[in-house]
C-alpha cells in the first residue's frame, strides 16, 4: 500500500470526534456518481445489489476518479530540531516532508504552512518547489501556534495535514485549535523523539547548554539519568495522547529515518 492509498482510506485515523470528522473511508480513490443498467464488461464489483433488487434488473454504480488530494505540512524550525546524536532531527523531518509531498501525483497540491502564510498557488503543483519554497522569514523564530492558525484559515476542508516537530512549546490552550484541525482535516502528527531517549551519556558535574538558549551547571548521576529517562518518556507519551485526543493520527519521528517514521504512522512499509 502506498502513502496516497493510505490517505484515501483514512488508514489509522482516529475517530474521536464522531460525526464531525470529515474524512471517512474513501474506498479505492473513486467517488459514486450515478446508477445505470449493467452492461457486459462492467466491473462486477460495482453492482448495486439493493438497487438491483428494487428494479429487477442489474444496476451498476458509475464512479469517477476521486478529487485530487491537497497535501499540506507544518515543519518545526525551532533550534531544538537542530540537535541529534548522529545528525540533526531536522534532517529526519526533511525526509518525512519529502516522502509526504512525494506521494502527490499530477493533480494533487502540495502546500507548506508557516506563521506568515502558505506556499504560493503557482508552486503547489510542484512537490519539490513546494518543499523548498520559504513560507516564513528565516530570521524569525518558529511560531507553532501561529502556523496552526494559518492552517485552519487557509486550507480547504479534507486537506491531509502533516505536522512534524518536537512540539515542546505547544501551550495547553492550543488543544481546542488542534481539535478543530482534527475535525476539519486528515491530520498526522510526527513527534520528534528526544535524541537521548535511550540513555543520557553524561556523568558527574557537567555544563549544559540549551538548544533554545540558556546554560546550567549540574550534577548528573544514576538517579538524575533515571529521572531524565522518565521525563522524556512521559513527555512523548503525553504529546502523542494529546494529538490523538484531537483526532490526529500520530507517530514518532526517529532521527535515523524520517521516511520510515512517516510510514509507521500509517502502518505501511515505506512512504512512497
What are the functions of these language-model segments?
Residues 47-48:
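Short, Gly/Ser/Thr-enriched beta-strand-loop segments that form substrate-interacting elements
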Amino acid at each position: 500500500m502506498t502513502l496516497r492509498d493510505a490517505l484515501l482510506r483514512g488508514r489509522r485515523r482516529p475517530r474521536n470526534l464522531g460525526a464531525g470528522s470529515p474524512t471517512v473511508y474513501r474506498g479505492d480513490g473513486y467517488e459514486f456518481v450515478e446508477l445505470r443498467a449493467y452492461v457486459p464488461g462492467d466491473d462486477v464489483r460495482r453492482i448495486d445489489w439493493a438497487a438491483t433488487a428494487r428494479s429487477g434488473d442489474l444496476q451498476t454504480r458509475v464512479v469517477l476518479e476521486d478529487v485530487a488530494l491537497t497535501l499540506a505540512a507544518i515543519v518545526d524550525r525551532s533550534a531544538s530540531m537542530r540537535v541529534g546524536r548522529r545528525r540533526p532531527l531536522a534532517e529526519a523531518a526533511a525526509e518525512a516532508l519529502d516522502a509526504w509531498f512525494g506521494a502527490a501525483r499530477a493533480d494533487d497540491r502540495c502546500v507548506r504552512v508557516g506563521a506568515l502564510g502558505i506556499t504560493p498557488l503557482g508552486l503547489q503543483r510542484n512537490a519539490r518547489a513546494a518543499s523548498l519554497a520559504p513560507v516564513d522569514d528565516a530570521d524569525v523564530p518558529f511560531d507553532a501556534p501561529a502556523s496552526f492558525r494559518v492552517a485552519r484559515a487557509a486550507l480547504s476542508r479534507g486537506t491531509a495535514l502533516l505536522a512534524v516537530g518536537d512540539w515542546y512549546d505547544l501551550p495547553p490552550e492550543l488543544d481546542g485549535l488542534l481539535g478543530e484541525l482534527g475535525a476539519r482535516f486528515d491530520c498526522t502528527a510526527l513527534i520528534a523523539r528526544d535524541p537521548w531517549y535511550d540513555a543520557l551519556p553524561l556523568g558527574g558535574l557537567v555544563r549544559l547548554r540549551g538548544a533554545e538558549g540558556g546554560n546550567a551547571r549540574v550534577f548528573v548521576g544514576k538517579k538524575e539519568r533515571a529521572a531524565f529517562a522518565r521525563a522524556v518518556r512521559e513527555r512523548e507519551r503525553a504529546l502523542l495522547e494529546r494529538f490523538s485526543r484531537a483526532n490526529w493520527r500520530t507517530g514518532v519521528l526517529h532521527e535515523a529515518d524520517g521516511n520510515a517514521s512517516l510510514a509507521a504512522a500509517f502502518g505501511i512499509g515505506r512512504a512512497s
